[in-house]
């Protein structure tokens, strides 16, 4: 069996040490000692307390709010430190890829920051990237190094079968057209029906019905405003059930990311209005901003389930049973083992394959 390094060295920063410890435990190894802190100047300091020369290094870091930028910087510095310490191969394991929603130029002068992050990882010295449930699979094309995009689908299937009463008569729902492929894949695996919700932005519809006008000359005060950000008060979203009959059904919403919870709230409301008996929301990455946490108990769902790609310990405790997590440590550990041994990663996600 081919091995690219003498042994697996698993490092982690401050983003999600609990997940790294769980992955290390499943691999039967100890985390490589690494101290990540800040100088008084707030610059990031990284000290690796064990040799990584000629080793197969995996750095697990999942940048998450409120310290996304600090976590990303930690990851880049750790990669660079291992590179200059003569590691044989460096794999960045990033369960929740940062800036993934900035993946296209959707307005004038908008940066494609997901591409910038890809460039930074490669320049820092990463030879390989492992991530999970990318917001857009095309992000893999931003890299000139190998990228493995893992899927939480098997873990979600297991949760549905074990925790959702009457799941065989449930229906899988995508809250928008963009997530239809993800939701239909899960529905096919479970042999369940599929429903799709259509989302419309009222301001966009109004704008499409008017002729373009010459914009006014900007004033000094306008230069200092958040001109590039949408004014939420000016955008009214409307959702309507486009495909599928949910009356009397247990509905399982599937999406890749929850931040403000706005999409989940609107979609669950539509399903309730159309006669759904219960609504579960299964989301790959729970960013869960402070605003979301304040309103989480009012979400019209029975359960909000997210993976532990981001540490949810405090949020779970604060939600009184509404929020649950799915453990992705097994699939990450197995992907690391297979990468180290030169085995197929795609085999992990074939039907009847186990890990």
Regions from the PLM with identified roles:
Residues 1-355:
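PRPP-associated nucleotide enzymes
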